[in-house]
């Protein structure tokens, strides 16, 4: 061998030395610091210290398991070998003629010293992270050093006619080879050095991406452990089995950083600024990958060109083999870059952007003004305006569940815009080089004709997407409201009507989806036809100009066109995602720009109102329906009890909300003491001495907000447990006795919004939360409404004014003024939005205002202190105070079993998605024939694409002569049989068939997509209906125990996947499967050996995919499950927003959301990690197949250039087709998880809808007969009614009393057949209701619950949801419940005599102009929140009156109204029900409510302990009812009511 010397060679080596010196500076500095004793580790302070960084802390076990010793010793050994070889070569160069190599060899010797110095540095550096960073330098040092001996060996070939060369062989050559080998091994060893021990955060290991070596990181090898664990522990996998996210990937850190950079920037600009490093890497890598993607085409051109030359010079294959090697290296490099690009954009962009936006939406929601108290103005009857959507809590959930996902998806794919442009430019340059500018211009002209159509359809598609989002919001919002009010709907037997309404919204949504899909189909046609027609036109013009078409030109051009086609074919999805992202970002922007709740506190000592006009946020002062409090001038005494009273709807709750800063101050000012922030409170350091913070606020809402947690967790509300205070709180709030009846005491899980508690218990838990809190200011909204007399007095004396209530500022809204009057310090009387009177009790009494209120109580013939119920017998007989309360369960956990969970955990299947799921999806829409047609379309499309390439092979293999014979190699079998096909045809003949095939492929390609879309929409339509029906008809027990977030997850996220992804993924999978089939067919046509190789690689791919799918399925299921808590937390927090903010806990709930989003992100992160693990290995396998195909083509001399072009054009697609095909299958399996979850709900157990149809007029009378009734909530639970027997004759009014847990509410459920009899019977109107059809039964009865349920819409839509009654019937019902006065009805177009003639001066004072109930078109906001609690109860009562049932059940239905209104309502109820063959059952706490009834049913332990007339029960010597009356404190008053009745 000979080496040519020159100045350029010496300069190159000198530059290399400088690079090596730069690479070695790190090791030199490390050794120098170590020698001078100044070496300090960044993370480890000593050998015994545990490693810690921002991600987490290492454990002793992980520290012991971590080691990089063998890597360092191997590096030292290889460095020594290199040094020995370099030293030997240096000595040899001292002997002529090798002395001419003195400079390069001595430079190599110098480099060997640097390598040795690096090896020493690995032992001198104590920090593992620093050693890892040093390994990066060492890798480049080794890699660059190798280039020198490689260059010497490569240039050692002796060029003919040159004189300046030397002989290089023998020892010198072998020493160079040894150095190259040692350098390669050293580079590999550097890649194997781990970075750090595994670190832990919150008790869980952190993701190991940055714990392992560079090799592990770039090959995703750190996923192996989790993959194997998932495969072996499918049934035990949960979110806690997954590693924690790194610090930079945790939601709190991401959101904090995002908010810092956002400022006043637009959201798009903020995302760019926050993620510019990742975006820059994305764009650079994508551009690099774009350039690399054309490398195989260049190599293909080189191979085909060399094969064409092989005919003239047989045996000259050197250049061909060089192109084969180049092809293999380019494919491998491209595979690695592509895999890393997709990992980067998902892990560093898609997931973080989703986390940031979800957190931002929630954090903003926690700061937004609560506008749900203000109704939207409908655009017309039944219309839903945009304002209503903005005020919907469900719309906010959609922003995080759907819109944030769409924006993050676009962040994942946006780089394809840049790469598409780059591919277009590079493709154009290559095509100009291959076929000339005229041919390319012809193709571009044909493609340009579609641009106007493309622009028009794109605009239409964008509009359709906006319509689709709006339609989805409307459907989801309605569904959310229905689920919240499902109990009322089931009681009213209106499941079908509401299902029809939801189905109507769903149909409108699917119509828009179909319109968007049609537009998208046109775009698909354009994007398929453009590259196909581009290639057809370009090659046709080229052939016409040149008269021939060579294989190298044709197939290379075709390969470029295929790349262009692949790029352009992704544009429909890219444009779809881009347009969706723009629409979604606009929606998020609108939410972010919504007004926020401002700071309302200042440095004052007491709460002051100075001539303030107050209204709910979002309202307008001039709108009649927007209630306004005017001229409020108040000063609440510190540490005193202030009582706010007034009639129903006078603004009492609005006044409380204004203290909390939840209202808009139109004029004047409100001053509230400033409370310390959570960080300033130091709750963990609280002691009894400093427990109360005078300026902190606690709030008890009119609708108590209860978390889906245990009783204790609801009371503590995040505060530390203080045993004595906790027990005192339970006693003061009257909860001690209730907890003793719960199966798990205060560890009882009480379900979403306290569904497992009675109304009174929910109120007392909410009050206990306020009592236990550290707040010095307690703001309470009528805590006595749902309490019986004794419990109310107990709470008043021991809670409100007891030890825990004293020395705190207490502001209370109540209708029970008489109860609170003795200890009231400040009294406020409201009337029609103004201050009727204010001052001390004495001042207000002297002015007569308080006397008026007390007179109303007198008129109502009731007073809380005169009331009693059976609930209190045990209190009276044995209450011993807080000291007698048992230690809470948490204090002795070992003595208890694990508490039962009321809410059920979401189920998760394991293993592969069953074929039954796929079959069910396909069969649901009754469009099986369309699926078959689509499948045939994919097969035909592939056949056309193979046929097009085959025809091109025939064309390029034909002789130039017009009538010449053409020999074509149709197949290459084992017997090497060659079949000659004799063809004659002109150039136009070839062109005509080629263009015809191209056009046919465009039509079939579009048709298959359209068939898939139609079939998918049909399946989605039916699946939605199939899941909606059982959910609406599920037993109440299931609806109560399944979190609403889990149900909504099915109807939002899962349905979104079904609507938008499953059909597309099926289409993509079919495309890739047919592509692979086409490639295999092409391989068979050339050589069976290629088929064998392809099958081997496919088996390897299937093995890898089986490992991947075993883990990916479970992770995807976990991801779906992890989303439900996010949605549940959204809904729960928005429901309790006022309570959360009043307690100053908004930031706490934001942190809770961070944790839930992180758990979801962990599943998404690992799902994509598994995807990349598979993708890298698949693309490497594809690169091997393509390279082997090229080698076989070059090796076999009998294969012509045209046949080689044919097979290579498909082989180049194998890499992409296999990897994307398996990725599509994985995505389909993960998307089908949504189908699996939806199908799970289609098989829910539903209530039996069968049964006999009663006569049309049934019940003609309201007689109820209960015989020995035994019912329970579940077969495994004990009975709640045990042998209950009683009879209600028609026309009777029956009161039901009993302590909590006596079975009163269970009786109501049994009457409606929500609880099926285990024994006994219930006869209504002479028929056994157990044998009746449920709808027929429930539609003939009516119940008014304690918690009223209203739906957003209008007054009419709530009174008469399905337009079955006239306006006057509705107005009459409103008049009967005294929401309208007689004078109001006179202003109506027509007037009918009201059923009740009860009017009073109080009624006549209502101003018709300010009464929203005077118009049936008056808007009702979501949940009826623009009405007071009392107004909502009255509206529900009016709704029941409209239905005119024969049997009416009231469950303390007027607990939230003032006493006089209650008296008026009770009088109306008595006039409407319990007369004229109808019956009335009232479950009541106020004894005066039922004291004059015909019968009293006293219940205890599920039995009727007494049943008879009030007089009979009162005269029973030892009866329960008599005990109630005697212990009431006002025995004479109750006796007067009872005896006057007779």
Curated annotation (Swiss-Prot):
ABC transmembrane type-1 domain mapped to chain residues: 312-580, 932-1230
Job description of the protein: ABC-type transporter; part of the cluster that mediates the biosynthesis of a highly modified cyclo-arginine-tryptophan dipeptide (cRW).
Residues glycosylated per entry: 233, 631, 708, 756, 1233, 1426, 1476
Source species: Aspergillus versicolor
Protein name per Swiss-Prot or TrEMBL: ABC-type transporter avaQ
Entry binding sites for ATP 1: 646-653
Positions of transmembrane segments: 5-25, 74-94, 103-123, 134-154, 173-193, 284-304, 325-345, 417-437, 522-542, 544-564, 927-947, 987-1007, 1062-1084, 1089-1111, 1173-1195, 1200-1222
PANTHER family per record: ATP-BINDING CASSETTE SUB-FAMILY C (PTHR24223), MULTIDRUG RESISTANCE-ASSOCIATED PROTEIN LETHAL(2)03659 (PTHR24223:SF456)
Stored CDD domains: ABC_6TM_VMR1_D1_like, ABC_6TM_VMR1_D2_like, ABCC_MRP_domain1, ABCC_MRP_domain2
Disulfide bonds: none
